[in-house]
Amino acid sequence: MRWCLALLICALVAAVNALSSSGSRLLVVLDDTTEKSSYSTLWSDLEGRGYDLSFESPKSDQLSLFAHGERAYDHLLILPPKSKGLGPALTPKHILDFLNKDGNIVLALSGKSSTSSAISSLLLELDVHLSNDRSAVVIDHFNYDTLSAAEKHDVLLLQRPNALRTDVKAFFDGEGVLALPRVAPQTLGSDSQLLAPILKAPTTAYAYNPKEEMPSPDDIESTGSQLNVVSAIQARNSARFTVLGSVEALEDKWFSASVKAPNGKKVPTVNREFAKQLTGWTFKETGVLKVGKIEHHLATDGEVAAEDLNPKIYRIKNETVFNIEVSEYVYDKWVPFEVPGDDKLQLEFTMLSPFHRLALQPTSRTETSAVYSTQFVTPDQHGIFSFRVNYKRPFLTNIEEKHEVTVRHFAHDEYPRSWAISGGWVWIAGLWSVIGGFLAFVVVWLYSAPTADKAKKTQ
């Protein structure tokens, strides 16, 4: 009995300490163990947020992402290796399998050394493209740190990013300047809806290898906002993969550094706060949606009895109500989900195609969830229909709910009477006019017999 109680207490403590909604086991892969001390503030912050950190070299024989067919870790943080590959346990196939098993990954790159072919192949699988020159970095002659990169201009100074669009939530915004040394440039494929830029390069930036001569404009592959500094991939299973172009931005040095832009003032960096936002989103501390109760029923004036909720069969032209409860995870607690101002959470009432597509409106809320509702009339079409909520937005986990119901015709005793249908009044009037005319004719016939003629007798 005591050991059961002890296990229960341990489980509760672990649940309280683990801020991530998907687990606390974090594997950090770094090639050189001497570099571990350069990121001590990052490790301390992650441990303070409840993560259980494990450090492994990509060359380690004990390294494995899976145990008995299941994930051995919940999250993966890969620092750029100095060798050509990541070892037999971290091939592109193994990493993609980890992603398909709902694992979350942060991949950090660096312009200090050329990117390995294994990482390039992995990113190509995700439609993220690196520069053809593996040693290229992002240069900007207008947004650089004059204190540390007065000549090379390879330490970018950027503002924290705003929301991607007005209908997308902002998870990485805020005040302050980010210092991003020696960024490895990356571009995103245009066909995938699963990719989203977190932080783009300024319009004055371009990518080139500083070891070579200054290129002509025709030799530059990508410039400006085509270049991404930080990119995000959210798979269809809502697993997350973040590509950070500058691993040096996570070092203790840049967490507490002061920088100065051209013609600007000396200001402290906000790299530490941005690192928390970035790892928090990737490891599912933010942007996680959860669906609670889903209810649908016939519209009534009063409260709905439990046995009347979620019926399997509706009738055509029924007034119907649909409710869905949605929560959002924010670091350590569930809160009511609020749809961005220019976005809509929608319900589709669909058979082969939607017969109704309706915006769901917030109707009530609790401390942990918000209830969205709508009311509509079932279509004049019988068949198998579905209540479907399909909400997929950048930086938010997917909501895909589908509940099937049957819609039937009127029963023989449910059709409206003919006198209740205004379109039938003319036919009813014609019927009664014929009956009335016939009765009038009968009366006239019966009471209008011809008189007999009185003829005189003649001999």
Indicate residue ranges for each PLM-predicted region.
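Fungal secretory targeting signals
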Residues: 1-16
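Short, surface-exposed patches at the edges or C-terminal ends of soluble domains, predominantly
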Residues: 16-459
